[in-house]
From Swiss-Prot:
The gene is nfo. GO terms for molecular function: deoxyribonuclease IV (phage-T4-induced) activity; DNA binding; DNA-(apurinic or apyrimidinic site) endonuclease activity; phosphoric diester hydrolase activity; zinc ion binding. Zn(2+) 2 binds at residues 148, 182, 217, 262. Signal peptide: none annotated. It catalyses: Endonucleolytic cleavage to 5'-phosphooligonucleotide end-products. InterPro entries: AP_endonuc_2, AP_endonuc_F2_Zn_BS, Xyl_isomerase-like_sf, Xyl_isomerase-like_TIM-brl. Its EC number is 3.1.21.2. This is Probable endonuclease 4. Gene3D superfamilies: Divalent-metal-dependent TIM barrel enzymes. It holds the Pfam family AP_endonuc_2. PANTHER family: APURINIC-APYRIMIDINIC ENDONUCLEASE, ENDONUCLEASE IV ENDODEOXYRIBONUCLEASE IV. Keywords: DNA damage, DNA repair, Endonuclease, Hydrolase, Metal-binding, Nuclease, Zinc. Belongs to the AP endonuclease 2 family. One of its GO terms (biological process) is base-excision repair.
Length: 294
């Protein structure tokens, strides 16, 4: 079974229940949500999230809760050189992991962080130390933290497979960490998923281990290979291309894990229903953007 969905929003007063409704509108069987705004750390009380209603609807419609993903806010940086800011990041992510666990979700995607000042080895160490504290603070919640592969914009940590491995190596309880493989980021970081997907996956397996990949972000890229820009494009309309992304989506290595679209809106309209159908049909629709622009 193809496990495919997209980013969805918390919907007003419907909250998590509204997120499920949105995913169903796209004919998705999984989804990725934020527990609040991704640009800040303000969170509404967990009691307002309509979790029971969301779970009931997912069960009715055949969405496996084990395939649902949360994304942590972008602004959290576990490797900030300021000890107080690192402590805040640990404190907030501890609360976020608990919140994810209370929602019944078992994995949270996290951007590893940015090496402010440029010392990457020290940054990697701080990330591992922060993850150890978060995991130690949340032992009663079986939530994995999925480290996202990054494009390498600025001083982002996680551009190379070696950096992902180094972070994981520093984590004591490795059952609580995994990897989110982002196609746009990997491409922009310089790994060829167009012509050498199997070679790239073999390289990841040799360095980190394919068994660590627990979610795939499926995005095309507005930039050429190795650009380090991180600019997502709609499926088939970027430099990676439809055929290459289809190989990722249907690759045997990713058969049992969720594939999540994070492609840009077109004319303020979500493209996900059309993109999901195009992926299921296995035929590129070069009119997709035109349809959304009407």
């Amino acid at each position: 079974m193809l496990i495919l969905g997209s980013h969805v929003s918390l919907k007003g007063n419907d909250m998590f229940y509204g997120s499920v409704l949105e995913a169903l509108e796209y004919n998705a069987n999984t989804m990725m949500v934020y527990t609040g705004a991704p640009q800040n750390t303000i969170r509404k009380p967990i009691e307002t999230m309509k979790i029971e209603e969301a779970h009931a609807l997912m069960k009715e419609k055949g969405i496996d809760l084990n395939h649902v993903v949360v994304h942590a806010p972008y602004i959290i940086n576990l490797c900030n050189p300021d000890p107080e800011r690192r402590a805040f990041a640990v404190e907030f992510l501890t609360k976020e992991v608990i919140r994810v666990g209370q929602m019944g979700i078992n994995q949270m995607v996290l951007h590893p962080g940015s090496a402010v000042g440029g010392n990457r080895e020290e940054a990697v160490q701080w990330i591992s130390e922060g993850l150890n504290q978060i995991i130690d603070n949340t032992k009663s919640y079986n939530v994995r933290i999925a480290l996202e592969t990054m494009a390498g914009k600025g001083n982002e940590i996680g551009k190379t497979f070696e950096e992902i491995k180094a972070i994981i190596d520093g984590v004591d309880d490795k059952s609580r960490v995994s990897v989110c493989f982002d196609t746009c980021h990997v491409h922009d970081a310089g790994y060829d998923v167009i012509h050498d997907l199997d070679k790239t996956l073999q390289l990841f397996d040799d360095i980190v281990g394919l068994n660590y990949i627990s979610v795939v972000h499926v995005n095309d890229s507005k930039n050429e290979l190795g650009a380090s820009k991180d600019r997502h494009e709609n499926i088939g309309f970027g430099y990676i291309g439809y055929d290459a992304l289809l190989k990722v989506i249907y690759h045997e290595a990713f058969k049992e894990i969720p594939k999540i679209l994070e492609t840009p809106y077109v004319n303020d309209k979500p493209p996900y229903k059309l993109e999901i159908q195009m992926i299921k049909d296995r035929v590129f629709d070069n009119e997709l953007k035109t349809k959304l622009e009407k």
